[in-house]
Regions:
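Alpha-helical substrate-recognition element adjacent to the catalytic core
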Residues: 2-121, 125-126
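Conserved acidic, metal-coordinating active-site core of Asp-based
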Residues: 110, 115, 119-152
Length: 152
């Protein structure tokens, strides 16, 4: 049996025109957010730690995340790529360490909501935002989403 070809894409700064996670860190946490982004990008800290820092801030809400997402577009050529994939029975899949609420929002606004998405989840519990990592690894908590495991 022939295996189906899959194209896997990240979301932040790959499918989208900016890294919305970085923008949220800075918008919500200010200078501390800039430090976290810098430490994250230099791999001094992992996504799980960064997510915990943003989630413990009272300002984080789905509405704030959606508001920030309004400024985000998608890269040129994505619709053409999706058309090519559909014509040739190739799966285009989004695998991200970002949050469902902004990924879903940006994809929906750009008529891409039918793409399969594997990402972290934001949930409101007792009035506080919690970030869940359904695709994390039990062996490592550096990344919120262990993309290697998702690709298996």
């Amino acid at each position: 049996m022939k295996k189906k070809i899959k194209i896997i894409t990240d979301f932040d700064n790959t499918l989208s025109t900016v890294d919305l996670m970085d923008k949220l860190m800075v918008k919500i946490l200010g200078e501390r957010g800039e430090e976290i982004v810098s430490d994250w990008e230099s791999m001094k800290i992992g996504a799980v730690f960064a997510h915990k820092q943003i989630a413990k801030n009272q300002k984080l809400t789905n509405e704030l995340i959606r508001e920030a997402a309004k400024e985000v577009g998608i890269e040129k050529g994505i619709h053409e790529l999706l058309g090519y994939c559909r014509e040739n029975d190739i799966a285009l899949i989004v695998v991200s360490d970002g949050f469902d609420v902004y990924i879903d929002d940006v994809l929906s606004r750009n008529n891409l909501s039918d793409l399969p998405v594997y990402c972290n989840e934001t949930v409101l519990i007792n009035g506080r935002m919690e970030i869940r990592h359904p695709f994390g690894s039990n062996e490592c908590d550096f990344c919120g989403h262990c993309k290697d495991k998702t690709l298996d």
